Amino acid sequence: MLNKAMNIADYDPQLFKAIEDETRRQEEHIELIASENYTSPRVMEAQGSQLTNKYAEGYPGKRYYGGCEYVDVVETLAIERAKELFGATYANVQPHSGSQANSAVYMALLKPGDTVLGMNLAHGGHLTHGSPVNFSGKLYNIIPYGIDEAGKIDYVEMERLAVEHKPKMMIGGFSAFSGIVDWAKMREIADKIGAYLFVDMAHVAGLIAAGVYPNPVPHAHVVTSTTHKTLAGPRGGLILSAADDEDLYKKLNSAVFPGGQGGPLMHVIAGKAVAFKEALEPEFKTYQQQVVKNAKAMVEVFIERGYKIVSGGTDNHLMLVDLIGRDLTGKEADAALGSANITVNKNSVPNDPRSPFVTSGVRIGTPAITRRGFKEAEAKALTTWVCDILDDANNPAVIERVKGEVLALCAKYPVYA
């Protein structure tokens, strides 16, 4: 019999210390990585439940194991809430990650060797959109599109490439692009050549759910997302569609299970159900509106301080700071800011002369700081400190001063009060 009083602290102090150290790091560091966020205690409660014990291969009502009557309720709640949240007629909540959701779409719609039009990783795309080091770039013939000199998606060039190469699938979405994507224009191009339009909305799913960023679901044949990032749920994946195509839905379900996964993670699916319910609340829209306000406030300060922002601004939760021409690499900026308890990630920028391991850019996002309660005033003060360090990254006195400011602000705005 298992005793409910069992705990990690008494049994495994080494592991417990690592967990406690990470908890303290999150409380004492300002998180500016655009893909990170803080999930709610309700989501964590679901993930720590006895649902983790249950195998449930298959789908609600069609399982390969007995005893699934209650996990069927959990998964159905998640499915129906996801559909309501995004205006979809189909949802699959089983993918373990965004990358696995994307893999399932490739498997459902394509054959190895088929041509795919996807956003260049160096211009803001994602590994799974055709990077040569990823399965997508290894198994499929990838034609990359990118942004123009103004930092905007070049739809004229996209259409030219589509007409020339006739891809079977076009991919919309990004991991480092701060503008608005014209989903309707992409669908128009896809229809012109008879291609599928697949949108990976992982980065902006929360903004879309709240109505502060255009929804691709009415335009794309299929849409994927992560459930963390701006959605602020558990780490996981999601597939959606409003194509009203039962054959497509069956292909997508089969590509997830049994095509790419076995048993779903029912405790994570419960966490997704909670997060979708939270995202349907009015305060979630207020949160997402503030995410964008904070991002715009940060961009304003960066530009005032003489820093170049790719695309010239932001219309979502992120910005890409271009350090080309400065005596500072993305890797060095990442390390210097980290020393002051500000967490960012180095990132390639368009026409980057440096390797992806060094880079000439820094990607910054506002979902996590907004979740803590930061508004424009805090976002602007924080950006001033970031610029102070970028201006003088090798000055320990500047780093120590900023670290003190960061610790004081973190104490004022705890992640979990």
Curated annotation (Swiss-Prot):
Its cofactor is pyridoxal 5'-phosphate. The modification N6-(pyridoxal phosphate)lysine is found at K229. Its EC number is 2.1.2.1. GO terms for molecular function: glycine hydroxymethyltransferase activity; pyridoxal phosphate binding. InterPro entries: PyrdxlP-dep_Trfase, PyrdxlP-dep_Trfase_major, PyrdxlP-dep_Trfase_small, Ser_HO-MeTrfase, Ser_HO-MeTrfase-like, Ser_HO-MeTrfase_PLP_BS, SHMT-like_dom. The record marks H228 as: Plays an important role in substrate specificity. This is Serine hydroxymethyltransferase. It comes from Shewanella denitrificans (strain OS217 / ATCC BAA-1090 / DSM 15013). The lineage of its organism: Bacteria, Pseudomonadati, Pseudomonadota, Gammaproteobacteria, Alteromonadales. The gene is glyA.
